[in-house]
UniProtKB/Swiss-Prot annotation:
Family as reported in the entry's similarity comment: Belongs to the conotoxin A superfamily.
UniProt name for this protein: Alpha-conotoxin-like Pu1.6
Keywords associated with the record: Acetylcholine receptor inhibiting toxin, Disulfide bond, Ion channel impairing toxin, Neurotoxin, Postsynaptic neurotoxin, Secreted, Signal, Toxin
Organism per entry: Conus pulicarius
Region Lacks the Ser-Xaa-Pro motif that is crucial for potent interaction with nAChR: start-end pairs: 46-48
Domain notes for this protein: The cysteine framework is I (CC-C-C). Alpha4/7 pattern.
Length: 58
């Protein structure tokens, strides 16, 4: 009986500790993606060869 009690305590601890982490929202993911793409295009725009191929982004 004590073993069953310990098993229940262990399972509830694992379930609650893994559910505490809040996943990033779509809004946060979209902002991060936009920042990464802006940084990538800034690097591209400083490179003459890349800028020539992707002028519509610069």
């Amino acid at each position: 009986m004590f073993t069953v009690f310990l098993l229940v305590v262990l399972v509830t601890t694992v379930v609650f500790s893994t559910s505490d982490h809040r996943p990033a929202s779509n809004h946060e993911n979209r902002r991060a993606s936009k920042r990464i793409s802006e940084m990538t295009w800034e690097e591209c725009c400083t490179n003459p060869v890349c800028r020539q191929h992707y002028m519509h982004y610069c």
